[in-house]
Amino acid sequence: KPLKLDHIKDRILGHWGTVPGQSFIYAQSIYLISKHQPSMLFISGPGHGAPSVFSNIFAEGTFGDFYEEFQRDAKGMSHLIKNFSWPGGLPSHVTPITPGSILEGGELGYSLATAYGAVFDNPELIAVCVVGDGEAETGPLAAAWQSNKFLNPAESGAVLPILHDNGYKISGPTIFGAMKNSEILNFFSGLGYEPRIVEGTNLHQKMMDVMEWAYQSICRIQKRARTSEKQFLAPRWPVIILRSPKGWHGIREADGKKIEGNFRSHGIPLGDVKSNPNHFKLLEAWLKSYRIEELVDAKGQPLPEILEFVPQGNLRMGHNKHAFGGNVRKPLKFPELRKYEVLFKQKGLTEASNTAIAANF
């Protein structure tokens, strides 16, 4: 149907700039899963771009598994769109209600530490962690890069950090966005990683190749550590730097001002589309550019070729068992507390160190 003014909410909320890049990474990740069937967990650092996660778990069918109203058809899609950033509906950021998520996406800086925590002593899990270039400037995130020093490939899983370097944060350029490729490579090499940069044209093929390289690197590191009698010290884990435009494939410019590839695409690119006819036309052209009629059938269900590489069952990242604590929880085994009791017959005569006793416990 043609776009009408009453199709548009009076107040539009959310963040666009990070969404296309994260959707791109999600799609590349599920393609890798379709090839090798690893257990992969998706962690969205810039979780304020929730549409990237919501749309993908909807497309893979996970959303509908947990919430009946989000079935993978026209009605479910309509419900998803209507209820995004809507009273009593879905929030504008990734939250605990999101299938497959273990991170609160509304506060930046904790994605990488969370990813490492998820894979410690969890040898079969790979956490794909998207780190925003603005997020990377926070203290917790900057420190978390060092967590690779504590990751034992013989006993733990792996983290695949993907720095989404789109060049801008909410109102200006980012530090990583201002760095040369050589500076970025040297930075991560100095941290003990093996970095690869994906940029330019034909990004789909480049990203597929680099994701495959990263996966094979992880497998080699883990195989060596788990089969060798000697301890494998300081492996160089892979890290990917994706340099793509902020607001990728969105509105290029409006009123003579650049939007795509600029901080203006961070949130809502055009907030007055109901009152500005020119902006309304830009919005309409933008929505039509996705050619939704080539992706879904008359019932709103994705065409078979669209789902060809989408994993099934628990291989879907939105259905990864490690994102649901109740599925993997184990009883916590405590020593018998009374064995560490300090016994005395008279006060003031017995000497004991509380730290030494606690250490024994």
How should each PLM-predicted stretch be described?
Residues K1-S39, P46-G47, E135-G139, A158-I162, ...:
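Conserved acidic/glycine
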Residues P2-N152, P173, I357:
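Cofactor-binding active-site loop characterized by glycine-rich and histidine/acidic residues
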